[in-house]
C-alpha cells in the first residue's frame, strides 16, 4: 500500500513538473499558427461497403504553374494518407507549405470526419481499396498522382500496390513514405524494454480487444479524457524525439489521438500487428520513391525504415536525426523538402520520356 501511495505521489509531482515545463516552453517560443484549421473544398466518397470518406481538395492558384516544376506535362495531384489514430489535419505543415500544387487530404475510415465501418472491416487491405476510390474520384482520366503516406498511411499505399499494381508507373508517378514499415511491427516498439518486448507485443492485441469491449470501453474513454498532463507526457515521449518540441504541437497530436474511439484503436492496432507488405515493394520500385525515418522513432523501429528503403529499388532515403514518429509535425521542413525533391524526380522522368518519344 505504501508503495502504491508513493507511486501516486510521484505521478502527481511528475504531472506538476510537466505543467510547469509546458508553461516555460510556451514562453520561450511562438506557437504555430492555425494548427488543424486549414480547410479545402469538401468531397464525400462512398466506399463499396457504404462508408462515407471525408475528402478535402486544395486547388493551386488559378493559371499558376508551380515554380518548382520545370516540366508540368499534366496537372499533378498529391494525395496524403494519414496514420493510425490521426486524421488529415496531421498534414498541417505540408498543407501550408506545398499549396502551389494540387493537394488532396482524406480521413481514413473510422478516423476524423469519415464514417465508421462495420465490425471486422478494419484492415489495411480495406484501406488500400478505399485509396483506389479516392484516386478515381479526385484525379480522373490520365491526371497523374503522387501518393504520400505517414505510418499506417504508408501501408495503405502498399495495400493499393498489392491490389492494383498496374497503377504504379502509369497513374501513380511517385510515392513518399514517412515513419512506416512493410512488416516487423509484431517484433515490438523500440520503447519497450528489450527482455520483455516479445511478451508485451503478444499481449497487446488481447489487451486492446478487451479494452474495447462493452463497459470497459466506457471506462477507458473516461480515463483517456481525464489523463491531462500525464497524457501530454506520454504523447511527447512516444510521438516526438525532441523533448523541446512546442507543447502546442504535442497538444495537437494528443487531441487527434484522443478523438479516435478506443474500438478503432483496438481494431486497427490488431491489423497493424499482423501486417506484411513486403511483396508490394517491387511494385513501388517502378516509380520514384522517397522514404523518411526519424532515428528517435519509438513506434516503428528505425531499423525497419532502413530495411524498407533498402528493399525498394528506386528509393532515396532521408534519415532525420533526433526526430520521432510524428516526423511530419516535428520536422516539417525536412519532409516538405523531401516531397518537393520527389516531385522534381517525377518531372525529370516525365521530361525524359517525352524526349525519347
Where are these regions (language model features)?
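Conserved acidic catalytic loop of the alpha/beta-hydrolase fold
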Residues: 128-144
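Conserved hydrolase catalytic core segment
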Residues: 143-191
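Conserved alpha/beta-hydrolase catalytic His-Asp/Glu region
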Residues: 212-283
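Short beta-strand/loop motif that positions the catalytic acidic residue
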Residues: 284-285, 291-293, 297
Amino acid at each position: 500500500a505504501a508503495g502504491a501511495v508513493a507511486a501516486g505521489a510521484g505521478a502527481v509531482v511528475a504531472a506538476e513538473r510537466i505543467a510547469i515545463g509546458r508553461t516555460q516552453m510556451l514562453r520561450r517560443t511562438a506557437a504555430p499558427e492555425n494548427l488543424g484549421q486549414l480547410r479545402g473544398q469538401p468531397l464525400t466518397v462512398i466506399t463499396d461497403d457504404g462508408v462515407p470518406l471525408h475528402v478535402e481538395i486544395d486547388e493551386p492558384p488559378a493559371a499558376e504553374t508551380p515554380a518548382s516544376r520545370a516540366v508540368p506535362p499534366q496537372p499533378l495531384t498529391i494525395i496524403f494518407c494519414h496514420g493510425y489514430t490521426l486524421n488529415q489535419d496531421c498534414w498541417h505543415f505540408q498543407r501550408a507549405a506545398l499549396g502551389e500544387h494540387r493537394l488532396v487530404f482524406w480521413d481514413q475510415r473510422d478516423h476524423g470526419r469519415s464514417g465508421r465501418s462495420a465490425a471486422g472491416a478494419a484492415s489495411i487491405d480495406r484501406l488500400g481499396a478505399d485509396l483506389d476510390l479516392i484516386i478515381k474520384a479526385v484525379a480522373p482520366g490520365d491526371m497523374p498522382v503522387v501518393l504520400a503516406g505517414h505510418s499506417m498511411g504508408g501501408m495503405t499505399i502498399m495495400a493499393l500496390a498489392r491490389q492494383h499494381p498496374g497503377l504504379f508507373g502509369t497513374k501513380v508517378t511517385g510515392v513518399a513514405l514517412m515513419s512506416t514499415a512493410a512488416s516487423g511491427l509484431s517484433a515490438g516498439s523500440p520503447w519497450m524494454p528489450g527482455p520483455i518486448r516479445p511478451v508485451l507485443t503478444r499481449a497487446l492485441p488481447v489487451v486492446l480487444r478487451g479494452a474495447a469491449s462493452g463497459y470497459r470501453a466506457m471506462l477507458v474513454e473516461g480515463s483517456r479524457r481525464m489523463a491531462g498532463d500525464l497524457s501530454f507526457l506520454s504523447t511527447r515521449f512516444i510521438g516526438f524525439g525532441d523533448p523541446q518540441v512546442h507543447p502546442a504541437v504535442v497538444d495537437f497530436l494528443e487531441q487527434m489521438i484522443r478523438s479516435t474511439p478506443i474500438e478503432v484503436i483496438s481494431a486497427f492496432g490488431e491489423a497493424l500487428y499482423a501486417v506484411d507488405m513486403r511483396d508490394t515493394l517491387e511494385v513501388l520500385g517502378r516509380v520514384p520513391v522517397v522514404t523518411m525515418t526519424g532515428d528517435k522513432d519509438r513506434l516503428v523501429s528505425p531499423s525497419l525504415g532502413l530495411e524498407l528503403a533498402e528493399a525498394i529499388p528506386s528509393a532515396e532515403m532521408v534519415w532525420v536525426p533526433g526526430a520521432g514518429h510524428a516526423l511530419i509535425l516535428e520536422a516539417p521542413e525536412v519532409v516538405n523538402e523531401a516531397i518537393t525533391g520527389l516531385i522534381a524526380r517525377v518531372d525529370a522522368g516525365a521530361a525524359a520520356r517525352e524526349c525519347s518519344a
